[in-house]
Structure formats: C-alpha cells, structure tokens
UniProtKB/Swiss-Prot annotation:
Cofactor remark: Binds 1 zinc ion.
Species, as recorded: Desulfitobacterium hafniense (strain Y51)
Cofactor: Zn(2+)
Domain of life, per lineage: Bacteria
InterPro entries: ATP-cone_dom, NrdR-like_N, RNR_NrdR-like
Record protein name field: Transcriptional repressor NrdR
Amino acid sequence: MHCPFCGNDETKVLESRQVEEGTAVRRRRECERCARRFTTFEKFEDTPLIVVKKDGRREEFSRGKLKAGILRACEKRPVSIEQIETLVYEIEKGLRNGSEREVQSKAIGEAVMNALVHLDEVAYIRFASVYREFKDVQRFLEELHELVEKKSSR
C-alpha cells in the first residue's frame, strides 16, 4: 500500500478490524518512511448491480442515491442516522442477495417504502409522494387512508 503522504510503498499494518457486518476490513497503517498514519478499507468487489429505470435506461446501483432519497424523506423526523444507515444496508443487502444482476427501479422504491412504513409514517408519506408522483391532495389522502387501514389491521 502506497503512503498517501510521501508515496512510499513500505507501510505496516497497526490494526485490522472487520466493519460493515464483516463485509469489509478497516486497517490502520503507518508509513515506514515518514511515520504518518492513515486508514484503508478493503471491501469485497461484487459484480455491479444494474438499475433499470422506468424509461428503460440502465445505470449502476448507487448506494449514495438510495441514502439521499431516504435522508430527504426523514428530514426533521426523529430518525437517527444509524437507523437510516441500517435501512440502506438492509435494502442494498436484499437487492444484492437476489439472483438477478439487474433490478427494476420500481423494486427499489417498493423496498424503501416497505421499510419506511415501519420506521416513520411521515417519512413514508414523503417518500411515497415523490416515488408515486402524487399529482394532487386527493392522492395524498388516498395514501393516508391506506396507511391508516394497514395500521388498524395489524
């Protein structure tokens, strides 16, 4: 591993630990030449997950886009960043554990909605309004009515 400070390729590992539920390794390293310390991460590289958009375009799955959408829905809600990280991790894990290397964007949206409905109902409605492209107040009311019915049948 090259030192990011001086470029030397002689570094020693001071500490290693598993992170992200054992799917990655965090290593604390020290340069043999300049003695500066830095952190590296090793992660298993899987074949990319491809998202098929509504219009048929294909693009590589972006964990960042998934997280940004959930963060937007949970803005100013009593939802911790840890809960959001867990949600993103679980959704991504579910997508990657499937047998398909291509996934419809609709499946991702539904997975987010299924998770948000249990986490925070306001965040669920916010996400649904964008994902399902609510055009008017009536559509909001319909979704709220469905949510109340689901809640009362539990």
